[in-house]
């Protein structure tokens, strides 16, 4: 390998490092979307025990989580940040979680979560899980705002890496 080939390999390596660092800005969003996807899939499956119109909510959330995942992967290698579907999904997840938190303490509990017994312990467990999901959703909304405003730590690392690679 001559000097020119080594320089080209080094340039490609730096370019890939920059691309990956920029894409890592969305890492926590991708993890939380995956968590919500599997949680909502589980909710769809338990709705088959006693099918009702309630099944529409987890199905909508699953569809939006798939669309948000596709949106995330389309961002790889692009400098533009468009998180419209992801933001819509996270907001929808937060709204539905808030509604479910309230409905957990009503007679709707057994329709929403037919695998749980209608007792205080089950309601508290479901309430805590829903509350954790709501907190994650709210943190995701904040993270998206930070990304749009370029206030996220990952963007600062990207800028530092970009500056250091320009100096080489």
Q: Where do the model's predicted regions map?
A:
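N-terminal signal-anchor transmembrane alpha-helix
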Residues: 1-54
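Juxtamembrane "helix-exit" motif on the non-cytosolic side of transmembrane helices
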Residues: 41-49, 73-77, 104-113
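Generic alpha-helical transmembrane segments
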Residues: 52-73, 92-99, 129-132
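Membrane-helix interface/capping segments
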Residues: 70-85
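Membrane-interface segments at the starts/ends of alpha-helical transmembrane spans
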Residues: 82-86, 112-126
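C-terminal halves and exits of single transmembrane alpha-helices
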Residues: 90-117, 134
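Alpha-helical membrane-embedded segments
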Residues: 123-143
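Short, highly charged, low-complexity non-transmembrane loops/tails of multi-pass membrane proteins
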Residues: 147-168
């Amino acid at each position: 390998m001559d000097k020119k080939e080594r320089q080209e390999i080094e340039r490609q390596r730096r370019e890939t490092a920059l691309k990956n660092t920029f894409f890592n800005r969305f890492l926590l969003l991708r993890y939380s979307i995956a968590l919500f996807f599997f949680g909502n899939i589980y909710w769809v499956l338990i709705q088959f025990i006693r099918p009702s119109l309630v099944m529409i909510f987890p199905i909508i959330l699953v569809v939006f989580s798939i669309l948000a995942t596709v949106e995330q992967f389309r961002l790889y290698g692009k400098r533009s940040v468009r998180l419209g579907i992801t933001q819509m999904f996270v907001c929808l997840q937060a709204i539905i979680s808030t509604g479910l938190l309230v409905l957990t303490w009503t007679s709707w509990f057994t329709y929403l979560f037919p695998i749980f017994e209608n007792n205080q312990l089950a309601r508290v467990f479901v309430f805590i899980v829903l509350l954790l999901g709501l907190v994650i959703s709210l943190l995701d909304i904040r993270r998206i705002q930070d990304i749009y405003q370029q206030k996220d730590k990952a963007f600062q690392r990207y800028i530092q890496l970009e500056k250091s690679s320009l100096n080489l």
